[in-house]
Structures are given as C-alpha cells and as structure tokens.
Amino acid sequence: MRRLALLSTAVVVVCVTGLMVMTSAISTSSSSEEPTVYPVLPAPGEMDAKRHIFVSGHSLTPRPMLEFMSQISAAVEMPIVWNSQNLNGSSIKDRSFGRDESRAWSGFDTGTDANGETIDALAEMQSSSKADAGKYDILLITEQHRLLDSLLWQQTETYLRAYQERFIQSNPEGEVFFFTPWISLSDKNNASDWIEYERAAMPVWQCVVAKVNDQPLNQGHAHPIRIVPASLALADLVGHLIANPSTSGFANESPRKIVDTFFEDDVHLTAAGNYFIAALTFQAIYGELKADDIPSSLADDKARTLRKLAADFLARYRTDNPTFDSKACGDGPSLSFIFKYTSYIERTYARPEKGYVAANVKRFRDMLRFMRQL
C-alpha cells in the first residue's frame, strides 16, 4: 500500500510538472487594455450614512456575528439595522437562480431571515420589513468556501453580478461588499497549512470581484463591489496569537487552545470568533472604532484585544492593498494556485473520505478540469 501511495504521488508530481511547462502562460492576461482600478475598502466616513444592511449568506455569516456587529454599532453611536437571507451550505447561485433548473431565480425565495422565518429576498430588498428603516444601503454577500469549485460549478462571477443587479434595482446608490469565506482547517493542531492557504487564496478572491466589477451592467450604474477580507483576517488573527503568546486576553494559550477559542469545529466560529469577524466587518465598512469602552458578552480584555487586532489588520490591509484590479489576474487562476488548492482539498476533504490513492486520483482529475474550464 505504501508503495502504491508513493507511486500515486510520483505520477501526480510528474504530470503536474509537465502541465506547468505546457501552460506557463496560463496566468498571463490576453488583453492589452489597462483595467479599471477599484478601492478595496471605503474611505473612513464614506459609509457613515449607509447603515441599513442586507446579508446574503450561510453559516459563516450567522445571526450571532450580525448581532455582535449591531451591538458594536450601537456602542459607537452608529446603529445599524440588518436583515438576512441565510441558507446553510449555499452558494450565491443557490440564493439567486436556485437549485431547481425548472424554476429560474427561485433561489431568492429560499433561506431564512433574521428571525428564522422564510424570506423572499427580492421583496425584502424592494421594501424592507424593518419599520422605518428605509431602503437597504448595503448588501453583504458571501460565497461557498471551496473557491475553485465555486467558480466552476456555482459560477460565482455570473451570480454575484446577478445578485448585485437585483439589489441596485431597489436602491441604485446601494453598495455591495463581498465577504471572503474561509475554508475548513486541515489540522486543528497545526494551523500553518490553513493560514498559508488563506494567504494564497485572497488574491484569487480579489480577482473574482475585480472581474465582476469589469463586467458591464445590463442597465444603469453601480458602485464597484468592495471586499471584506474576513478569511485573511481570521487567518492573520490565529497566526498572530500563536506567534505572540503574551497577548492580553490570550496569554500562555497553546496553539491548539487558540484555535479552539475561535472554532467550534473545523470551520464554524465560537462566540469569540464571531465577535472578531463582527468587529472586522464593521470596521472594514465604517472605519476604525471611535470608542474603546464597548460592552460585550466576552471578557473585557479579550474583546478589547480582538477589536484592536481587527483594526490593526485593516490598517495594514489598507496600506498594502489600497486598490485592486484584474491586471494580474489573467484568464484564470494560476497553475500554482490550482496546485495549492487541489492539494489542500485532497488533504482536508478527499483523503479522510476516500483514502490516499483515490483522493490523489480525484485531485489530478480536478486539476485538469480547473485548468481547462476556468
């Protein structure tokens, strides 16, 4: 069995090496036109008057996170009003076009709202059920977390644009923020592979949004979609706390304890994880918090540290990534990212289910499919 596993690995490596030689230009753009440059995040204060938020998401944008965000907003005297279309495990396509091909666009009728009741997302965006809240100013939307699988099978670019167009029909001045989802941890005892993956995935998510922004609207005008870099921020948080064991509120915690502090399982968040993402999302949209004494159900030192680390991350992110565009994106994901993505998926999902050899056969088939079709 060990010999067969080694042979399987060798076959994958040889084939991948050949593919890299044959497709070295895969990430080179075929267009000579200069792409439009988009701001990653709003300028501080730009969104202050836009506080009515509609969220289209799944279990990574749960009610506890949004309630924390609402509590933070009230504490800094910038109260938000929100509602959501939440459908666990869903893609943007599921929440718009729908899963039933015979009922086009029935996906807008799926999912539950902030109260756990069924929702008609189109009707809600057109006329909010929140009393005296007015039109929704902001759409916060996320995708399934398996990035390349979502691009291929769920047509992220197509349905992100479709959802944006439906949203701005109800408010032409509405703003859209794409919330980057994080993938499952491959090993909770060693988060380094997950952190490395999320760092590699972030530029690909940016390319997805840039390409959507580059597409012409069917009608009218829309503000460019911005990005809430939740996945990268979460990876940065875990990496920072592991590397800095004296951090206030998290002192002397083991790497596994830090991971368990934020993750209920291998992907869903605890209260501390949701609080960090709430602080990150609020500050990504509205800028750094202007108050430090913010009540929370978390211990004060933990909550204060999480808010500060979210702010510090965003300050670095604004400096390092003030804008994004599709110039470096090419016609599809780079072969190096396809290799990294399929390796991570094989190790995290396929191998525990199928075994080493079958998982690597699947990985090679997936690599070919992504290279040909993305």
Question: Model-predicted segments: where are they?
Answer:
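N-terminal signal-anchor transmembrane helix specifying type II single-pass membrane topology
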Residues: 2-23
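Signal peptide processing junction and immediate N-terminal pro/mature segment
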Residues: 20-33
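N-terminal module-boundary/linker segments of secreted carbohydrate-active enzymes
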Residues: 30-75
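Structured segments of extracytoplasmic/periplasmic soluble domains
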Residues: 63, 68-76, 142, 166-170, ...
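Conserved SGNH/GDSL esterase-like catalytic core that processes O-acyl groups on lipids
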Residues: 63-157
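Alpha-helical cap/lid subdomain in secreted, periplasmic
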Residues: 124-267, 271
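Conserved catalytic region of serine esterases and O-acyltransferases that act on ester linkages
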Residues: 251-374
